[in-house]
Amino acid sequence: MSFEFWYTLIIFILMIIFIIREIVETEIVMFSTVILLLVGKVITIEQAFIGFSNVGMLTIGLLFVIAGALHYSGAIAQLNNFIFGRNKSVITKKLFRILFPVATVSAFMNNTPVVAILIPAIRSWAERTNFSPSKFLIPVSYAAILGGMCTLIGTSTNLIIYGLMIDFGMEGLGLFEISKLGIPIALLGLFYIIFIGHHSLPEHKESFSMIEEKTREFVLQLKITNEYPHIEKTIEEAGLRHLQGLFLFQIQRNNQIIAPTKPTQKLKLGDRLFFTGLPKTILELQKTPGLELLKDSIFDLKQYDASMVRPYEAVISASSPLIGKNVRNSKFREQYNAVIIAIHRNGTRIKKKIGDIILQSGDTLLLLAERDFYRQWYASNDFYLISQSEVVPSKPRWQVFVSVTSLGLLLFLMILKLLPMVVAAGLAVILILATRTLSAYEIRQSIDFRVLIIIASAFGIAEGLRSSGVAEFIAQAIVLAGESLGSIGVVTGIFIITSLLTNFMTNNATAAIVFPITFAAAQQIHVDPRPFIIALAIAASASFATPISYQTNLMVYGPGGYTFKDFFKIGFPMQILVMVIAIILLQLFYF
């Protein structure tokens, strides 16, 4: 075997390890892989960067803008008015009413904003009707995933595969070509959740309340009295800025709340200082002359709803630049003008100094910030804001109409095959821009450039796997394992490998990695690769067994108070169900 083969195989294995272990961001890993393949002369410059001009990547970028228009205009928020009834009925009826609309909408647009809008709505509705939100949040995430399997534009994974098919000399998938597998899978998957799966979900207390109760254990107030030697000095001068194990996040002066606190803020007699940190270090601080511990005072997060400062919850996204950094080095306060007062991971609060905590994807942050924080950051890709009391800022009704019309125009042109998909998406975006439905800032926020880098890099990696012989080598192993059962055995092998990978790394990366292997496997047994690639598309999106496998799973992980085990209990049977149905349908339609 050649140098290129061994070099590519080693780089390929290291790439998977780095992505699964989240050593650095996925987009950095994949782009670095392309550069290393280029350095090793496995691929040419043209092959390395062909993905940056691929129609699949460009289409995804345009679809981000269309989804952004639906999100920012408040069109998606209208879904809330339809799916939540006023009366309290049995949980199966409620799941019916919620999940089917979610799956339908997710079939035609990015499911992240759909779930982001529904999380606070479900929590608020559940609190009013005495339901447990944890009975609904995982089902909503799964419904969004199932809906995305039904059409070409339902998920970016399908569009990556569409672009790779064209790059490999094939005709791309049609808008509804995947539907004959996706729709039956979605229907049976939803019925499983509604009648069977939800019984395995826990009935957790509303997560915001849990965080509030835990926060009371670690937040205390100290009052400045006459004996304090640093009255009229700044926080920095008083030595309260860089305390070991403590953080001064707020000052209450008469009826005024000062938060976040700045190093230059002066301290005055009678100020109430709010510290968060480990109890033993707080008790050490109270020994300072002039700082009186207010034992009977209660830190109540809900008191801020009517003030200039209020609490927020945010879930760290899988592509966040905060991942791998501790809170201190992340400059969170300076970057977002908000203070972290608690961090929850895997359903429990992390009991250490906040500044030393290394942030991970899925962490739930309890924040204090000013009232405009939500408006400024609700569409950020760094974290998902899930504050119950907030609603998405709405736009005039005519802009809601424009955003919905843009999606309708795209679907009309694609269904009738009047224009190529990228051109149809471009026309829809022109409509949005011409009517100023989105501002320049909103357009930038709508486009997830990290995802686009992953997608563009995927084409160079796929080319490297193919030209080096690594894809053919792995494909041979799959063929040897499944050829006794014919084509269906090989497809099953591809489905299993893809399902395993997609539950521990992003579905986009999984699709890009497995595509050249799938293509090579079909060539080796001399059959049409199309059904194999459709199987890959379904398997790459079928991310149910872990919370880290899909962005919507990650979004509901913290707010639902779930553990890893909760996802596995409902998600693993779903994973098996989807695979079995897909294999049966592939056998029926293609083999």
In which residue ranges do the predicted regions lie?
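Juxtamembrane and boundary regions of transmembrane helices in multi-pass small-molecule transporters
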Residues: 7, 128-134, 138-140, 147-217, ...
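Juxtamembrane helix-boundary/capping and inter-helix hinge elements in multi-pass membrane proteins
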Residues: 72-75, 85-90, 123-135, 162-175, ...
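Hydrophobic transmembrane alpha-helices of multi-pass small-molecule transporters
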Residues: 1-61, 65, 199, 203-204, ...
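Transmembrane alpha-helix interface/packing and boundary motifs in multi-pass membrane proteins
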Residues: 15-24, 101-110, 142-153, 412-418, ...
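Generic detector of multi-pass transmembrane helix bundles and their immediately adjacent loops
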Residues: 469, 475-578, 585-589
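Inter-helical loop and helix-membrane interface segments of multi-pass membrane transporters/permeases
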Residues: 1, 47, 160-173, 344, ...
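Hydrophobic alpha-helical transmembrane segments
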Residues: 5-13, 27-32, 58-61, 92-100, ...
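Membrane-embedded alpha-helical segments and adjacent helix-loop junctions characteristic
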Residues: 28, 32-35, 39-129, 190-198, ...
